[in-house]
């Protein structure tokens, strides 16, 4: 078991190593849609690439989610398979968001032997989600 400082150092090293291996600018928060973002997540059990829709207005949040959900067939056939769509996802802080994600199980940020596998997963899945978004962003952004 690592101390808190060791865990923080290891996570920092993980992200620096990822940035060195895949040194490119990701869209992440630069979607031009308020509270709509792409994210990476990793812990000691899994790695995930996510789309989080966190709009404070539930109606708008659901509209954005439903836009992507309407494209689910195209998204899964042409870009990323095995996506999970969660219209009402509850964060630990009690906030309700909409989340779409793909995950790789049985990997760990604390074990360097998994890092390349996680990095490749992150790159492949995020790149595919970004390509989908860039192709369909006008449709996704067009809500009432």
Question: How would you label these PLM feature ranges?
Answer:
Residues 1-144:
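Charged, terminal alpha-helix-loop-beta segments
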